[in-house]
Amino acid sequence: SPTHSYSTDDTFTVKLVNTSDLGCSDSLVKTVYVFPNPIADFSINDSQQCFNGNSFAFSNLTNINTGTMSYAWTFGDGNSSTTSSPSQSYASDDTFTVRLVVNSNLNCSDSAFKTTYVFPSPVLAFSINDSQQCFNGNQFIFTNGSAINTGSQTYYWDYGDGNSSTTSSPTYSYATDDTFTVKLVNTSDLGCTDSLVKTVYVFPNPIADFSINDSQQCFNGNSFAFTNLTNINSGSMNYVWTFGDGNSSTASSPSHAYASDDTFTVRLLVNSNLNCSDSAFKTTYVFPSPVPAFSIN
């Protein structure tokens, strides 16, 4: 009673011939069928992917000599598919075992296993102390709130004006007034990246200045004419003048006559339509005029 394993799939005729010790013989023939086995195999477009945008495409490379096949995929995360060459996106970062089970129409089967790696992607967040600031004294404080499930990450800040930083939570002052796009790019130790963009506004500051027709005048007939020399890159302005004697004006270029002789500090306060301000100060001198008097005998 022999045992035999066939090295190929096919249909074979098995013949048993029995011979007696007296030379009498007989034979019996039966047929055995060795069905073809599928040879399961598959490839992956990229077995190591970052979580953000992960998309695993599985190409079925299974073959069989004859017959048809059905497929059962399990992706290691509870999901499955019966298509020939499926795609799968994972909902979390982890290591997963992908299994392909192939069954032929004659109920012969084979399996193939491969591992996919979904690396954690950085989750970006940052805040700004104030995204709208006037040019004078502008200082933007960027507080990094980024996180990652496992591993480490590096930071790259692009301030939108040609300058950058690699610190975690930088502080930056702009050299011009404008609108800037700030971009934070984080890269994990496994090469996964993400970016976040926000806009900051540096409003133009007025540059306050003025001239005086004559800053030193005698009391009699004094008349100080103030010429407004303020400028701003863009926008409109309003003005508040204080003359140092309790009087004020909102005209652009006012005139003023003092009611007493003294030294006065004139202040021009300029506010833009975006609430940015600047001031200029100058001194006026009102000299006492003689008071003539004489008597006659």
Regions found by a protein language model. Give the residues of each.
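Extracellular/lumenal mature domains of secreted and surface-exposed proteins
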Residues: 1-297
